[in-house]
């Protein structure tokens, strides 16, 4: 078991500090990619929680043990279909705690009280009447971290495996393709 946990499965170009935009963006972006592949749905965005990522990712070698430490919980990936109204409400919950993890294409600004001022997906405002497909984990879909708006969504897909296993496989596939872990340093939830 020790040798398995020390087994190098990938490399990170730079350090992704704990609870940083670099780390949460990487996790949200790969969640979006992985769930699209697993579910076959055209998913619009991914919502994850900073608290579910338990440690930083250092630059250099990434071991199976590190990934297991980063994602120790028994959470499963899900696809939800929800109204823009409920999505905006969920973004308000995220803003009230200083922002959280969103995938590429999402840009949210909020005020000091935690109220969303602007929420855009690929440059277009979130429409309260439109339906959106959202990738997330069962913990959030069940209302964890006060994400009650997600409990009103229709559940389209629920994976059977712990999502950390999918992250491990994603990193292994990246390595097999001769690529390293990279992230985008952008603040997708900004307090104005």
Can you name each region flagged by the protein language model?
Residues 9-18:
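Short glycine/proline- and acidic residue-enriched helix-loop micro-motifs
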Residues 21, 25-192:
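Feature captures C-terminal
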């Amino acid at each position: 078991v020790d040798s398995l946990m020390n087994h190098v499965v990938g490399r990170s170009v730079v350090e992704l500090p704990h609870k940083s935009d670099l780390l949460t963006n990487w996790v949200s972006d790969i969640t979006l990619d992985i769930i699209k592949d697993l579910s076959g749905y055209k998913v619009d965005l991914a919502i994850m929680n900073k608290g579910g990522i338990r440690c930083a990712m250092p630059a250099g070698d990434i071991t199976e043990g590190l990934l297991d430490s980063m994602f120790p919980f028994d959470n499963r990936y899900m696809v939800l279909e929800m109204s823009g109204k409920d999505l905006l409400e969920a973004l308000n919950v995220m803003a009230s705690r200083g922002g959280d993890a969103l995938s590429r294409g999402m840009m949210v600004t909020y005020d000091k009280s935690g109220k969303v001022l602007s929420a855009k997906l690929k440059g277009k405002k979130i429409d309260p009447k439109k339906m959106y497909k959202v990738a997330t984990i069962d913990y959030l879909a069940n209302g964890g971290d006060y994400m009650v708006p997600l409990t009103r969504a229709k559940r389209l897909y629920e994976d059977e495996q712990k999502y950390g296993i999918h992250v491990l496989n994603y990193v292994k596939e990246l390595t097999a393709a001769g690529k390293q872990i990279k992230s985008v340093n952008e603040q997708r939830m900004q307090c104005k």
